[in-house]
Amino acid sequence: VFQALKAKGILVGIASGRARYGVPQEVQNLHADYCVKLNGAYVKDDAKNIIFQAPIPADVVVAYKKWADDMGIYYGMAGRHEAVLSTRNDMISKAIDNVYAQLEVCPDYNEHHDVYQMWTFEDKGDSLHLPAELAEHLRLVRWHDNSSDVVLKGTSKALGVSKVVEHLGLKPENILVFGDELNDLELFDYAGISIAMGISHPLLQEKADYITKTVEEDGILYALEELGLIDKELQFPQLDLENHTGPKVTIKTNHGDMTLVLFPEHAPKTVANFLGLAKEGYYDGIIFH
């Protein structure tokens, strides 16, 4: 899909809540023109030039850690090149290991590195709220029964994508996006065309301009073909023409009879096309040009 789009001069990008080191290698190998990571806090192009970055202020990180410790909440921190945990237990492992495997424990990580995103690890669910002094700077985005992303207020996938759009001198109406989760809501509000995957959050589907098939059904490819951004590859069935019982037409030519097997799904006007070509002079009595 990426190569087909690039061949038409269309730039492609990936916007994710994850950092690059949490993205599967096969996705990295696609070489997207732009990558919006960590819910919009870090944006790079394929040449690894930084387009935009918004680390969480150091004093806000310290204040968050103190609040988490006071509340008995475990936490994690995501930097530019790695992420770490405040501790390790079964609850944390079940939440984070499918996204970032084998993270080290380093509660003092922020003392020597910029932090772009943090996490809570707890069993409080949607009842968890930041205190007012932290809520001025941070917001929680629940993504797991036992964890929320803790992101800088104002950052989002939409912000990161907008920085790419500004960098390219484009406008939001020049952008088409796909999404499936709640952290895509702001992105759907921003982009000119928004497409929800087949099994996506109901709130996201309400905002979508178009709902495609599921990931397993190649929903992205399907939507791009339907919109004409990628040429649809026609799949003609291989048939035993001698024994085929479907519709056929025979055209008399100077070189003998030409028998065509008709596939209504792909070429319902085959005969009309041949007649039209003949009438318009593309048939000189010997061959079609």
Positions of predicted regions on the chain:
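Active-site phosphate-binding/coordination module
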Residues: 1-92
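Acidic, Mg2+-coordinating phosphoryl-transfer loop and its flanking beta/alpha structural elements
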Residues: 16, 161, 171-215
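Phosphate- and divalent-cation-binding pockets in alpha/beta enzyme and binding domains
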Residues: 21-25, 129, 160, 186-187, ...
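Short, structured coil segments at secondary-structure junctions
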Residues: 30-31, 39, 133-137, 190-191, ...
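Short hydrophobic/aromatic-enriched beta-strand-loop microsegments
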Residues: 32-40, 54, 95-97, 140-142, ...
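Short, acidic/turn-prone active-site loops that include or flank metal/cofactor-
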Residues: 39-42, 144-148, 199-202, 216-220
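Conserved acidic, metal-coordinating active-site core of Asp-based
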Residues: 67, 71-190
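Cyclophilin-like peptidyl-prolyl cis-trans isomerases
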Residues: 232-289
